[in-house]
Amino acid sequence: MKSPIMLLHVLLEELGSQCGVSTSRDLKTIAARVEGEGESFLTLTLPQFCKDLEKGLEQGRVTDDLWTGFRRNSQTGLPRFLGGFLRLVFNDGDGRLLDDASPEALFAVRQTCLFFSKIELPCTPKRTQAAFDRFIQTEMEVRDADRNWSADSRDRFDRVSRLLWSNLFSRVDNQIRAAGVLPKHGPGQTADRLTGNRKFNQSLWTSRLEDVFPARENVVPSDHPRYWEVLEGMSVLSPGDELPVRVTDVPKTLKTPRLIAIEPTAMQYMQQGILEVLNTEFRNDDFARDLVSSDSQLPNRRLAKQGSYDGSLATLDLSEASDRVSNQHVRHLFRNYRDLFAAVDATRSRKADVLGKTIRLAKFASMGSATTFPVEALVSCTVVFMGIERGAAVVGLPCPGPDSTLDWERWDRPRRLTRRDVYTLLGQVRVYGDDIIVPAEYAEFVTEELESFGFKVNLHKSFRNHSSRFRESCGAEYFRGVDVSVVRCRKVLPKSRADVPELESAVELRNHLFHRGLLRSADWMDERIERLIPFPFVEWAWDETAQDYISTSPVLGRHSYLPCEAGKHDRWLHRPLVKGAVVVSKSPICRLDGIGALMKFFLKRGDTPLEKDHLERSGRPQSSRVKIGWYPLR
């Protein structure tokens, strides 16, 4: 960790110079704590320091329970570590949040503390085991929430879900009834360990799938007798014999791994088809498009910025959101739509293999199921509006005023939400995964409603205070209208050209530092990367097709907003070239022919042709390498 510490020193010095703060004592503290505590100071202790800072922002003042692991000023409670920055955010006399608190100083503290918070390092076996224990514990809590779900709450859930999604679900239901689900194989692993082209020769189906999605309509090109032999060779599993999802851990942070559930091939195959139908209809539905569409995170970020500017919107964060969506919630959500209900239920795995032990699932699905994300959004958004309905009986509803501003319509008595009310709230409520945005007046009611359904609101990452106006959603953070989002180091720095994932991450880190205006830190990264590969400037320009800024060259390069100088010109194509490195990889050999190859053709989406060797190689590459050469600059 020597090089990362050096980078952190450069970064902290640069942040100090931007804010006019001396950081010499802070640098000594970091060096001493890392020597005594190891890398956990950077990956665990400093992120906790930032959590305490954000708690102080939400409270509007410093309290005694903050920064307990650091020496503090006895009068104000401010820690001495990074104290120069914190005095620009909190009053040095009484610890209250300053009216003119510096967004730059806040960014400096957060950037320093969170720089290594998401670095991918393997957890200790103890922490990994704790993650699996939490998975089991969450499953038990979902069962408890199901038992405590009152009849009144169920009726309200049914009514609000019909109000929000009846048109959407009717269209999806009709699409499924008309055999409009086109299955699709995902790129990842499956519980039966089929990869690449082998998935097109699947030999397992389930009786539950057969009732809704017959194999003759989804596994073979047609019901022609020539394919009967394939169907007869398939094993159709009864519900008791179905393969469980395989729960496994993948690196996330040093604090805890991420747990995902790897689905069986047949389930994932049909889940992808349902997901495609849902996403298409989301875009066509007035409510779903504005409330739960997953096409972009930008709407959430814009609303978070608005909330930080005027305090009108609160940002809520759910912990273990996908693992806390009960299957009972989903069954009630879809129960009036026969074909949609049957399709979602047939493609849901009922059992999970957790460290060799098979358990029956009360949750709908974990991360790994293709339908988890949209179904989670639909359920949680329904509960959010239940909370808003309850809160509206107390604080009223926003309504358009004569000058197109929002006034508040007071209710004389409790009443039910109407479609007009929902239209009024569009642009103020949005759900993206575990990130929720609601009007600040309803935040407390929504939180209570979510928790009554078994969801767990992470209060350390939820913000609604009007005076502090710090908001966070979908990876973007804002303070009083100013973007204070931080750059994170995701992987250890590369030592050689052979460390391809680390090299790609280092280039990405360098460019993120550049875009955040941390030019000295970006220069430090330039020096290290140039020792390993040619590292030219490449243009960072707007692309109309992608509707975003992208690099105009395929090489690993440093972004520039200015036109870049070419190393030479292509004599045949007359285009500028630059010498640089590109990452090349090959999919593993996985040959496919016969009926499976024909199905791959029929299931293809879009106009882009398949790779010429797609029947010879398929699946995620197992390794990659860096290739040096001359490549187009633009």
Where are the model-predicted features located?
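Glycine- and small hydrophobic-enriched segments that form the cores of compact globular domains
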Residues: Y227-L237, D241-L243, T248-K252, T256-R258, ...
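Conserved PLP-enzyme active-site core in the AAT-like
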Residues: S293-N300, V446, F453, F479
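Conserved polymerase palm-domain catalytic core
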Residues: S308-Y432, I437-F453, H460-E477, K491-A498, ...
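Short helix/loop capping segments that flank catalytic or ligand/cofactor-binding pockets
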Residues: R258-I260, M270-Q272, D323-S326, G481-V482, ...
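Conserved pre-motif C helix in the palm subdomain of viral-like polymerases
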Residues: G240, P244-F287, L361-G391
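Extended, charge-rich low-complexity interaction segments
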Residues: V486-L513
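C-terminal, non-catalytic extensions of nucleic-acid polymerases
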Residues: M1-P257, P402-P414, N511-R634
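Active-site-proximal segment of RNA-dependent polymerases
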Residues: A261, T265-T315, F385, G401-D412
